Amino acid sequence: MINELSILIPVYNDSAVALVSVLHSQAEAIDGLEYEILAIDDGSTNEAVIAENRAIDGLSHCRYVIDRHHDCRAAMRNNMTSKGKYEWHLMVDARLSLVYDDFLLRYLSSGAQRGEAVCGGVCVDGGADSARLYKENLRFRYEKFEEKNHSVEVRNRLPYNSFRTTNFFYHRSVLERVPYDERIKGYGYEDVMLGRAFRNNGIVVRHIDNPVAYTCFEGNAAYLKKIEEAMLTLHQFAGELKDYSPLLGMVGRLRSMHMLWLVRLFHRLFSG
């Protein structure tokens, strides 16, 4: 079993205290594990959240680091890997929650090799508010629709297309050799581009059952803004992502059937 670990948590206007506390408890319970937990803040603007996250410094082997010097999410995540002092890294997003009490053990005992990335996956948990969220929240409804694609069996059928950076375990040499693509300045598709780069460079992507849960969902206006930004990124890199995006696949099929004019007409009629 692997006995050293740098846990890297990107933070932006989210409290990471709950996640760090649970990860810290799990790490402390593993005999012989050398570890650190770094919550790295990429320029949060919410002062209340920043103040709350400073409590992380009170836990052993844990640090809250404010680092405002990145021009994109990809650069921030590449820099996170350089800050981790151990050979094995786990990257997990701040606003997610753990599902299993042996989350860390599942990764450390997964048989991970130096030349591969191991993905635990994601799930959706709206708790007692699930029915209301399904009616009112677009992000929750989308994630519930996609939930059927989150099983280990489905993800391993197309391991590179299913790669997500919200929750993955890797040897530091993986991202040193094949880093995030810093050409992506806007929101979205960093993980898709990284999965594509892994495939092109012989990095194995393996999926296991070790999900983190979405339990917080942004409002509809914020979510639609993210979608708009992601569509701009997709358009910019369409040539490279054509085999990795279902949306681009649909556009290709419409083009082959000479039906794109219908989509353009619909957009003119209903976009105001």
Where are these regions (language model features)?
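Short, well-formed alpha-helical segments that are part of the catalytic scaffolds
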Residues: 14-28
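A conserved acidic beta->alpha catalytic loop
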Residues: 41-50, 96-97
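Glycine-rich, basic loop-to-helix element that forms the pyrophosphate-binding segment
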Residues: 67-84
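Short aromatic/hydrophobic "clamp" motif used to bind/position activated sugar donors
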Residues: 89
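Conserved donor NDP-sugar-binding/catalytic core segment of glycosyltransferases
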Residues: 102-134
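Short, flexible, basic/aromatic active-site loop/helix in glycosyltransferases
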Residues: 138-160
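Acidic donor-binding loop at a coil-to-helix junction in glycosyltransferase catalytic cores
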Residues: 186-194
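Non-catalytic, C-terminal membrane-associated alpha-helical segments of glycosyltransferases
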Residues: 226-236, 240-272
